[in-house]
Amino acid sequence: MVFMNKTLLVSSLIACLSIASVNVYAEGESSISIGYAQSRVKEDGYKLDKNPRGFNLKYRYEFNNDWGVIGSFAQTRRGFEESVDGFKLIDGDFKYYSVTAGPVFRINEYVSLYGLLGAGHGKAKVSSIFGQSESRSKTSLAYGAGLQFNPHPNFVIDASYEYSKLDDVKVGTWMLGAGYRF
């Protein structure tokens, strides 16, 4: 009987420590992901023939099992030109950068939802063969939302959308990435 009580006590102690360590397990965890970004740029109904493409980098920190914070950096770029009979008349370049951050809520052990708020910066430069050149840049509010999936405890799949309006230029950016959770 004494042996059985000791076994029950040790088993209960191990179970309690296991449960406590599961709660602590998510606290302080981080993840980093890198991925593909593609923007769609519109101005007064006109859009670029080819979408600017680039990359996205995200870092996430979990405060506890439910809440965390995420930071994001995105960059997309597209060069373009107008030619007549192989003769280049106009050369242009569009670049977009954003830095955003926001809260993360873990729905379950596999899925988390997050919101983003920060700054988006766009720069367009156009030059012609006649020596004329024009450049415009604008920084404005950027906001978005996304999901992170953890199909495996150490693997992250990230998908998000971000929007920014730079005066009359509207930039919507889709991002898809993968990363490591540690």
UniProtKB/Swiss-Prot annotation:
One of its GO terms (cellular component) is host outer membrane. Residues 1-26 form the signal peptide. It is a multi-pass membrane protein. It is found in: Cell outer membrane. Pfam families: OMP_b-brl. Keywords: Cell outer membrane, Membrane, Signal, Transmembrane, Transmembrane beta strand, Virulence. SUPFAM superfamilies: OMPA-like. The keyword tRNA-binding does not apply. Gene3D superfamilies: 2.40.160.20. The keyword Membrane applies. Promotes the invasion of pathogenic bacteria into eukaryotic cells by an unknown mechanism. Belongs to the outer membrane OOP (TC 1.B.6) superfamily. Ail family. This is Attachment invasion locus protein. The gene is ail.
